[in-house]
Structures are given as structure tokens and as C-alpha cells.
């Protein structure tokens, strides 16, 4: 029996959908609201100037995060599926490269959260026999994600074995 050669580590070919930038921005805005509302209440109830400074700092930091980080993420996040493996590159501060050999794929799922539905985006989750966990491809066009899930399912069914 010939030992299998692992797929090479290389940059994945495809970027996520450009609408993912807006998805990440809307998520940052939601975080801003969750953090700012209690600070506004504290400022109104106590009148303490420290709460005003805290609120201003929170707003400035999260607005900067919401404007710049999604653009950086878009430049970095990549994915690719071949007959041999699923490749992903993600992260903006800490970058994560993942390669899941097709022979290890157990399930393929798509997810459409509320903001993703609004923007017609989806996340494809590829569950493998790895202890490291599932491989996620977030920020895909919803139709492209459905086609990717269908194609990946067909590819994995053609590979013999039980993916363990």
C-alpha cells in the first residue's frame, strides 16, 4: 500500500463574496449597540462624566473596528475545494490555515443567520474526523454556498471509506 501524500499548503484560490464586508460591519455594529446601550443607561442614571468618556471610547474603537477590520478580513479570507481537499485561510489578527482532506469529510452543512439572509450570504461548514473541529467557509454568496455544498457532498460520496 502506498502512503498518501498530504495536500500541499498553498493560498486558496477564491475570495469570499464582497458582501461579507457588510456582514462583518453589521456584526460590529450589533456589538457596538450591545456594549453602548448599558453605558448610555449608566451615564443617564449616574451622570458621572467617566461614563461619557467610556462611552466615547467604546464608540470610537468599535466604529474603527467596523470600518477597517472587515476590509482586512476580506483581503485575507480565502477558500478552495479540490478533489483532494478543502482549503481555508481566515483571521485578521491571527491567521488560520486549514486543510481538510476530502477523505476525512463527514458532513457538509450550510448556515444562513439573520444578517446573512439579509445580505444573501451563507456559511458552509465541513465537519471532519479531525479533533481540531469543523472547517468553516463564511461569507459566501447563498447560491454559491448551496452549489458548493452539493458539489462537495457528491465529491465525498465518491471517495471510499467512512471518513474516520
Regions found by a protein language model. Give the residues of each.
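N-terminal basic, Ser/Thr-rich segments that initiate or prime the first beta/alpha elements at protein or domain
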Residues: 1-103, 107-164
Amino acid at each position: 500500500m502506498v502512503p498518501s501524500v498530504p495536500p500541499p499548503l498553498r493560498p486558496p484560490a477564491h475570495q469570499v463574496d464582497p458582501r461579507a464586508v457588510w456582514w462583518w460591519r453589521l456584526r460590529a455594529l450589533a456589538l457596538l449597540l450591545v456594549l453602548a446601550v448599558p453605558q448610555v443607561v449608566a451615564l443617564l442614571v449616574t451622570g458621572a462624566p467617566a461614563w461619557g468618556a467610556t462611552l466615547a471610547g467604546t464608540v470610537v474603537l468599535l466604529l474603527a473596528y467596523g470600518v477597517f477590520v472587515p476590509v482586512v478580513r476580506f483581503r485575507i479570507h480565502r477558500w478552495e475545494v479540490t478533489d483532494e481537499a478543502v482549503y481555508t485561510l481566515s483571521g485578521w489578527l491571527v491567521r488560520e490555515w486549514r486543510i481538510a482532506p476530502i477523505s476525512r469529510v463527514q458532513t457538509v452543512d450550510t448556515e444562513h443567520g439573520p444578517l446573512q439572509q439579509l445580505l444573501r450570504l451563507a456559511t458552509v461548514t465541513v465537519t471532519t474526523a479531525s479533533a481540531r473541529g469543523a472547517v468553516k467557509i463564511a461569507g459566501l454568496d447563498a447560491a454559491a454556498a448551496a452549489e458548493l455544498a452539493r458539489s462537495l457532498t457528491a465529491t465525498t460520496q465518491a471517495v471510499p471509506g467512512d471518513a474516520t
